[in-house]
UniProtKB/Swiss-Prot annotation:
This is Phosphate-binding protein. It comes from Unknown prokaryotic organism. Heterooligomer with human PON1. InterPro entries: PBP_domain, Phosphate-bind_PstS. Disulfide bonds join C113-C158, C306-C369.
């Protein structure tokens, strides 16, 4: 089997029948942090208790750091070959909540910052929400790529809060004033755990969280129900009040379509393949959009260029061929899970780099992978 796991954000997608091609074991969602460790150190026990299997790929919403890339290049690349890190799909980060009321909850960016810093501790602090009572934040307990995507946004946009947000995979470590301002904040593990805590009927209503869109609502239409999933981005433009947007895929696709490709000369560097949104631009950092839903990013795939087993090499190539294909691909499943497929120019760049046999980056290139390969 081709064994892999990691981020829970795309877990439902990768468990959708026929998304993973023949030879792939079922995806195991444990969080991006454990997924990266599992791949980088070939530690299958990050997925559970089994220590006898090898790890062949990972899913992560958290981009590999410079240190992670350098360590792998020094310790593993000489025997196993280069790693490949590419975006899989684009995603919003949704803000679902449990607080009954007839009004739509539409957060300005400043209000969103206030809720997650603890500055706004009562629902009455959100204008137009028509609700009152304590706000209780639910956050991911473990190292989470969804948390990284969310804290990137908070870091870029929440510049007038009493404290500052750092970009991190661990929410409890993000805000400079700690969790103390978030009275009664609740830690939960995994996307399933977060939604279970959010919807816990044994406690008073009032909880709010951040999560991927496939978990935020039971249906695609549910993402547009602002009595359960907040709109984000209300404000005043040229003296006219404007509503925020829902986290539905249609509201992030325009921003994704204009993200620039990595330069052809740089495509051997795994770092350049994953654009991130941030406060500053350049060096792979893209400005947050001025329109549409504002909290967005990518979930990524981490594979090896070389596998010791020829059958596994072919199976990985088959998956790339389908996932990044022009037709008979995974786009319908991606959209059904509330994500956005990569634009056609991005798919073409992935195919040209990692599937074209003559390209030195191609998966299983016999000249490059001669004597190298990730263990079977």
């Amino acid at each position: 089997d081709i064994n892999g796991g990691g981020a829970t954000l795309p877990q439902k997608l990768y468990l959708t029948p026929d998304v993973l091609t023949a030879g792939f074991a079922p995806y195991i969602g444990v969080g991006s942090g454990k997924g990266k460790i599992a791949f980088l150190e070939n530690k299958y026990n990050q997925f559970g208790t089994d220590t006898t299997k090898n790890v062949h790929w990972a899913g992560s919403d958290s981009k590999l750091t410079a240190t992670e890339l350098a360590t792998y290049a020094a310790d593993k690349e000489p025997g196993w070959g280069k790693l490949i890190q590419v975006p899989s799909v684009a995603t919003s980060v949704a803000i679902p909540f449990r607080k009954a009321g007839a009004n739509a909850v539409d957060l300005s960016v400043k209000e969103l910052c206030g809720v997650f810093s603890g500055r706004i501790a009562d629902w009455s602090g959100i204008t137009g929400a028509g609700r009152s009572g304590p706000i209780q934040v639910v956050y991911r307990a473990e190292s989470s790529g969804t948390t990284e995507l969310f804290t990137r946004f908070l870091n870029a946009k929440c510049t007038t809060e009493p404290g500052t947000f750092a970009v991190t995979t661990t929410f409890a470590n993000s805000y400079s004033l700690g969790l103390t301002p978030l009275a009664g904040a609740v830690a939960a593990t995994g996307s399933d755990g977060v939604m279970a805590a959010l919807n816990d009927t044994t406690v008073a209503e009032g909880r709010i969280t951040y999560i991927s869109p496939d978990f935020a609502a039971p249906t695609l239409a549910g993402l547009d129900d602002a009595t359960k999933v907040a709109r984000v981005g209300k404000g005043v433009v040229n003296g006219v009040a404007v509503e925020g947007k829902s986290p539905a895929a249609a509201n992030v696709s325009a921003a994704i379509s204009v993200v620039p490709l990595p330069a052809a000369a740089d495509r051997g560097n795994p770092d350049v393949w994953v654009p991130v949104f941030g406060a500053t631009t350049g060096g792979g950092v893209v400005a947050y959009p001025d329109s549409g839903y504002p909290i967005l990013g990518f979930t990524n795939l981490i594979f090896s260029q070389c596998y010791a087993n020829a059958t596994q090499t072919g199976q990985v190539r088959d998956f790339f061929t389908k996932h990044y294909g022009t037709s008979a691909n995974n786009d319908a499943a991606i959209e059904a899970n509330a994500f956005v497929p990569l634009p056609s120019n991005w798919k073409a760049a992935v195919r040209a780099s990692f599937l074209t046999a003559s390209n030195a980056l191609s998966i299983g290139n016999t000249n490059v992978c001669n004597g190298k390969g990730r263990p079977q």
